[in-house]
């Protein structure tokens, strides 16, 4: 049935009128695999059409106890993020079963136990000293530093300070750069490269220079002509993947003398938002560059520094009377 679901989702569009991404379909199938494995271990006979509300409630309770409770702060419960995601990812399977097999969807029942998403916290904004030290750990843009890995890592850290999400950074291609104009083009992750919704990202002068240096060393890489993607891996590998980016950021933080547990690629997005807000860039401009449609995102990013920005803004007025 999961193969049927895969085929079904591959031929329809989502609620936004766009084809489902492969990673989204895989997430839905993974949820189905988790349910199937639990049914097998619990000696529940039959396929997914035997799942009623009671069965799903048992499954979600088991998943919550096994996966979410250990992640809670006190180890006794309270965190429900994993179960909430699993519930949402299983819904398409039961929608499909309702359409194709006339199986009543447990999701339509008020008796289904629903696990809420945990409240969003305030991600930590990186300090100016942290970013500066990490850039120094990658050669600080010195023309005397010419080895591929250091030049690449420095350029990547620089691009992260421009507010790109990890997947947006990894999806960049050489053709997306316009270094003469100090801009780059970012294609929305769930759209094709012909979309009119691509965003133009303004680059800091040092970021443009770091990218120019990277392009020079990239040309010497054995995979330079084998992939259109901008960032190349090490040891003759092709395009850089998320795991490589994650390890890179952690390693460079450690090289700079910081606890790598305190940083992830996405930390730079919040830092970028705080930098622009503190500099007085309008919320409208920040939303346009970042591609946000909702002001809620503007409030969330850099939220941990909101009080500091407010104090500095008021103090900057000096004596008012």
Question: Positions of the model-derived regions?
Answer:
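N-terminal core-binding DNA-recognition domain of tyrosine recombinases/integrases
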Residues: 4-23, 29-121, 137-144
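Basic, Lys/Arg- and aromatic-enriched nucleic-acid-binding interface segment
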Residues: 133-166
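Short, basic (Lys/Arg/His-rich) helix/loop patches that form interaction surfaces
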Residues: 142-146, 247-288, 307, 316
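Short, charged phosphate-coordinating catalytic segments
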Residues: 160-181, 284-288
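Conserved tyrosine-mediated DNA breakage-rejoining catalytic core shared by Y-recombinases
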Residues: 171-210, 296
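Short, polar N-cap/turn motifs at the start of nucleic acid-interacting alpha helices
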Residues: 176-179, 260-262, 281-301
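Catalytic-site neighborhood detector that most strongly recognizes the C-terminal catalytic loop/helix
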Residues: 188, 192, 290-316
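C-terminal catalytic core of Y-nucleophile DNA break-rejoin enzymes
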Residues: 192-213, 226-249
């Amino acid at each position: 049935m999961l193969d049927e679901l895969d085929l079904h989702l591959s031929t329809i569009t989502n609620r936004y009128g766009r084809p489902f991404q492969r990673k989204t379909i895989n997430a839905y199938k993974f949820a189905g695999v988790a349910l199937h494995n639990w049914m097998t271990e619990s000696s529940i006979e039959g396929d997914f059409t035997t799942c009623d509300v009671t069965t799903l409630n048992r499954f979600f309770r088991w998943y919550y106890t096994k996966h979410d409770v250990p992640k809670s702060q006190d180890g006794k419960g309270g965190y429900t993020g994993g179960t909430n995601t699993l519930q949402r990812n299983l819904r398409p399977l039961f929608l499909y079963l309702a359409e194709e097999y006339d199986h009543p969807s447990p999701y339509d029942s008020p008796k289904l136990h629903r696990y809420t998403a945990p409240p969003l916290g305030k991600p930590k904004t990186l300090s100016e000293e942290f970013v500066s030290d990490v850039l120094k750990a990658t050669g600080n843009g010195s023309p005397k530093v010419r080895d591929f890995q250091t030049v690449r890592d420095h350029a990547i850290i620089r691009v992260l300070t421009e507010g790109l999400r990890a997947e947006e950074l990894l999806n960049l291609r050489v053709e997306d750069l316009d270094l003469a104009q100090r801009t780059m083009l970012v294609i929305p992750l769930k759209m094709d490269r012909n979309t009119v919704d691509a965003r133009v990202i303004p680059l800091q002068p040092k970021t443009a220079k770091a990218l120019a240096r990277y392009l020079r060393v990239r040309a010497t890489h054995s995979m330079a002509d084998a992939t259109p993607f901008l960032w190349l891996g090490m040891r003759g590998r092709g395009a850089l993947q998320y795991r490589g980016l994650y390890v890179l950021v952690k390693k460079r933080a450690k090289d700079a003398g910081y606890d790598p547990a305190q940083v992830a690629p996405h930390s730079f997005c919040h830092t970028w938002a705080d930098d622009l807000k503190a500099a007085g860039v309008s919320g409208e401009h920040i939303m346009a560059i970042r591609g946000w449609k909702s002001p809620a995102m503007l409030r969330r990013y850099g939220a941990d520094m909101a009080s500091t920005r407010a104090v500095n803004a008021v103090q900057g007025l000096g004596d008012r009377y």
